[in-house]
Amino acid sequence: MELQRAQRNLKFLQNEDYVNVTDQTNLNGESQNAYSLGMETQVPEMQFSLSSDDDSIGTQVKSVTAQKSPMTQETTKNDTERNKDVDKSCNPVSTSHPDLGGSNIEENIFINTQIQSRLDDAEEETNLKLKLEKFKYSFKSSNADDTHSNANVTAKRRPAIRKANSKLKTKPKTKRDPKIIKNITDFNINNYERSRTASLLKQLSGKHKKVLDIIKTQNEGNSDKPPRARNNKGEKATFDTYSEQEWKDIMKLLLQKFPQSEETDLNEVQKFLYGSEKSSNSLDNQESSQQRLWTASQLPPELPDEAIQPEQEERIRDTQSAVNFLSLSQVMDDKSEIMKDEESIIISRGDSTSSQEYGNGLEPQQPVGNVVGEDIELAVGTRINAFSLTDYKACKPMSVEVSRRCENSTDNDYDNISIVSDTTDETSTLFPLDQYRYVFIENDERPPLATDTIGSTQFFTPNTSPLDGIIDLTQESFKAVRSLISPLKVENNKTGVTSQASNQVQVPATRTPTIIPQKNLTTTLKTEEEKNNIGSSIRVKLLQESVVKLNPKLVKHNFYRVEANDSEEEETEFDDQFCIADIQLVDSSKISTKDSTQNPTTSNDIIDTSAASSIASPEKFCEIMMSQSMKELRQSLKTVGLKPMRTKVEIIQSLQTASQILSTANPDNKGEHGGVANFSKIEIFDHLTELIEAFPDFLERIYTFEPIPLNELIEKLFSAEPFVSQIDEMTIREWADVQGICLRNDKK
């Protein structure tokens, strides 16, 4: 069987060679395919036995194939030679290519199936590479067929040196278009400013067309070029307002709709409204009538006729109901029960004191037929320090009339309270007031005026009563309440001991300073009047006739005319009869100099001792200064308020100069201060106050609260006293704050 199988394969190979020779164009491809097909057909066509002698059969086949192999080689050689002869006889073209078949055809060798499969894979790979146009690596073929078939294919190789990647070419920069908007705000302002104003006017006005016409006419008037017609139609400016002639026509049309009346009817209406006196010739002369009406409307209300009869007055009083009015101050100070008990004492005291000292004993005005001779009139005045201008009827002394008719009257509706007529000529009831407050008191019983030596704001703890800070306007001038109630609560300490500094809170309520010195100043800035007499006079508004009758010694200054009335009062013909005068209340106490005249020797001794002490003081002062350390000297400079110095000699000279100047200015304060310096910061404050009082123009600026530059103030003080250059700037600021001087930093 093995022999038969080998012969069959041999025939198959011979037939395949014959086919390959006939088809020379596809020699390489088809011969290989036929050979592969022949090899592949070996495995499925072989019929192996399934007996247990498979291994022995395999070994026998190997031996037989080994014996027959030389025979097959010889037969293949003979067959190939025969085929060559046949090809030469059949195909004459093959003579030009004698070596084509012999050189390219390899010997067909029977090989193993596994090796054949690998060969097939290699052939498929080469065929696939031949079909490719580009490939990464070139392959080397050992077969002649491959070299011949790949001769026309040129392998492309990558150069060894790679070219640098070309950079992206930047586009050439083009010029910026001027039409492009850079800033939208500038663009809107330059292009739409007029339209914006027009739109704003539209929003604020009622008629849009009217505003547009006004803007258009303004633009036409301002521009030299002829204005462009809107929408190229040549529209002209039109207005919605009426011309003068149009207004006249409208007025005529309006008057025609009203009912017509004759002049007699109008005169009757005029007479009914304004009386017979003002209705005459009212239509003939309209200007005169209007002028009379205007003047009549501006005149003050007419005073009641003094010649009225008592019966007529009683009838008016009965017909009109009394209007009871009461002010807030009267409600708070109403003491009607006390007044009823002591009315007689008050009236008698008022009659005795009003005319002698205070110049307020005015002659009662006696109306004709209204007041009986036995009536009592009490002049009630108020003590004021401020320059008060009031209404004529308010300044007119209120009279308390007790007439016989009132006393004998049994009518329950009418009481004994005084009746005072107001500006509307109505009878009104005046509620009783505290007569102790408004009637002048004797000199001995008058309470002393409260004066403020420092003029600074005082601070109190919450434990104080609010009534302590109320100022009586009849006893003092109107000022801000200096007593402030702190909103802070007092902490209850277990020990029960609280420091006064912890309960005081500085709250600035006025222009007065917020820094309170440890010791009250001996001198403060005051006007010339305050220096001469503090609280010794009052300024009141009185009749000129009554002031002339006063004692000339009581009137301190000349009379002041009333040049301006209050904003709520009306001008009357009685304004010229009043004046404002400063009347002295208490004679200033004269300082007696009897002791100094009686004992001249003692005064001379004092002068001698002071001179001796002043002569010996510089040496003693230098000894004290030299014994002190540098730290103590600097602390003394800081305490006193002088500028710091570098060396010890400069500090001693500064303190010595200050002590000499302040000792000459205040000789009474020698020896009061212990320590290094024999003076304090308060004495420096007093010395600065004395220096600034020598400049009236500066005082005027201080009193008017004008902010003064600090440099200017220091230069002014330095011109009066060179020692000011050694005073620290913070000390001057503190002194200015205590005195109420407004300062500002002058930055040059």
UniProtKB/Swiss-Prot annotation:
GO terms for molecular function: 5'-flap endonuclease activity. Residues 62-75, 277-298, 591-602 have a biased composition (Polar residues). Residues 62-104, 215-236, 277-303, 591-610 are annotated as: Disordered. The keyword Nucleus applies. Residues 76-88, 222-236 have a biased composition (Basic and acidic residues). Transmembrane segments: none annotated. Belongs to the SLX4 family. This is Structure-specific endonuclease subunit SLX4. It comes from Saccharomyces cerevisiae (strain ATCC 204508 / S288c) (Baker's yeast). The lineage of its organism: Eukaryota, Fungi, Dikarya, Ascomycota, Saccharomycotina.
